[in-house]
Amino acid sequence: MQWAVGRRWLWVALFLAAVAVLTQIVWLWLGTQNFVFQREEIAQLARQYAGLDHELAFSKLIVELRRLHPVHVLPDEELQWVFVNAGGWMGAMCLLHASLSEYVLLFGTALGSPRHSGRYWAEISDTIISGTFHQWREGTTKSEVFYPGETVVHGPGEATAVEWGPNTWMVEYGRGVIPSTLGFALADTVFSTQDFLTLFYTLRVYARALQLELTTYLFGQDP
């Protein structure tokens, strides 16, 4: 009996050690990456259009991103607004760029929505174009409110409660192990809403973004 208990603890210790080693490898890998975008670059671009009608702001932002990074933003025919169900909330996203280590997307909701933020092996920042963003950080007893032009940063491994007012739209930039975020992003779609068409749209646009980055890496770079 004692031997069985000891074996269980041994497996737990080995599992935790493997997780620690994997985490270290992941962060070392991220340190070797040449990122296309910078968090502050995306935030500054979004601030230029904060307060405008969100559709006008998004169209201007896309034009500017294509000017700055012409081979790293999906073409118009690949842009699509896709529902996202995660953490008990529902929003919509339009993916502009994605790789294994970063992404840029447009995100928001036409209806107010409280939710759990999720925990990620990635840093995620949202610069607000319109509406309000309430954030309640883990370990605190008060929430913060963010308005158009402000940027909300969600660090790796952090968890918060968030709530958006109606017609809240933002520009989001993520950097880290991007495939690790898909579990949270798709869990409700698979196990709750069972909206498999949305699941297909999400995976398809991510695959196309990866294909664009691979093609750019192999055959061409930013001028």
UniProtKB/Swiss-Prot annotation:
Residues 1-9 are lumenal. Residues 31-223 are cytoplasmic. The chain crosses the membrane at residues 10-30. Belongs to the ERG2 family. PANTHER family: SIGMA 1-TYPE OPIOID RECEPTOR-RELATED, SIGMA NON-OPIOID INTRACELLULAR RECEPTOR 1. Sigma receptors are classified into two subtypes (Sigma-1 and Sigma-2) based on their different pharmacological profile. This is Sigma non-opioid intracellular receptor 1.
